[in-house]
């Protein structure tokens, strides 16, 4: 149910299948595979995937962007935005549809009754809708912020968006500190190896498999750590730019160009 967080934190669930989301020079999983005996490594390399979310596999997350999401939340909390309610409802509805088996009763009903929904190859395809709507809302947010003249008023006016941002960040930290970072396939692999009756065959696979899974976990943690660092960096830059614009150190054109670059 927390998979939509990939819109804002692309690496929270590993990003994509394989090991391409991380620099090969820094990949502990790749290093571990290279140190294995060739025969063992060939049989285990199929399990070397950074993605550990709930949709089985993916070529990449529907990443909207940190800055886009931050401004989208501001746009959705703007009282002058006449479209915020139906867009908010559509985004939430899309999240519910994308949950698939994690919200099974609802999705089975939608599959049977929502026109054309049964033509989708996977429930996650619906994520293209919130990605588009967040981009539209980000434009509202940028326009709203760029017209402000009082920094304290900004903090008060858009307080709901800051609260939601804080809750999202708290959820990310909760996932980071409480998750095993192991996929279902890896748990099944270790379980199957533990059940091998032949002691020699079991010994040949058990240590390499555990080493590989632990290395993949390390890589996954490094991805989410990088996302968290990027979040605070981009948040700091956005706050600084807004403050400078309100104080007339930079004009609105420079502010909007800077927002576009960060996005």
Question: Where are each of the predicted segments found?
Answer:
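Contiguous transmembrane helix-bundle modules in multi-pass membrane proteins
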Residues: 82-263
């Amino acid at each position: 149910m927390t998979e939509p967080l990939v819109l804002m934190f692309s690496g929270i669930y590993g990003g994509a299948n394989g090991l391409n989301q991380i620099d090969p020079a820094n990949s502990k999983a790749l290093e571990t595979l290279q140190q294995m005996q060739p025969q063992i490594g060939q049989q285990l390399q199929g399990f070397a995937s950074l993605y550990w979310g709930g949709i089985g596999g993916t070529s990449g997350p529907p990443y909207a962007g940190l800055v886009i999401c931050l401004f989208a939340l501001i746009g959705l909390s703007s009282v002058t935005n006449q479209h915020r309610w139906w867009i908010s409802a559509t985004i939430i509805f899309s999240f519910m549809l994308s949950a698939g088996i994690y919200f099974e009763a609802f999705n089975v009903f939608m599959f049977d009754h929502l026109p054309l929904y049964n033509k989708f190859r996977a429930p996650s395809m619906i994520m293209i809708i919130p990605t588009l709507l967040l981009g539209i809302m980000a434009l509202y947010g940028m326009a709203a912020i760029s017209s402000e003249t009082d920094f304290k008023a900004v903090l008060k006016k858009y307080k709901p968006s800051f609260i939601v941002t804080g809750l999202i960040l708290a959820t990310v930290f909760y996932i980071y500190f409480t998750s095993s970072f192991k996929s279902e396939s890896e748990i099944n692999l270790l379980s199957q190896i533990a059940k091998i009756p032949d002691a020699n065959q079991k010994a040949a696979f058990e240590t390499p498999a555990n080493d590989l899974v632990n290395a993949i976990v390390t890589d996954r943690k490094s991805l989410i750590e990088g996302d968290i660092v990027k979040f605070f960096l981009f948040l700091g830059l956005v706050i600084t730019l807004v403050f400078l614009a309100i104080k007339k150190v930079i004009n609105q054109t420079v502010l909007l160009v800077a927002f576009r670059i960060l996005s």
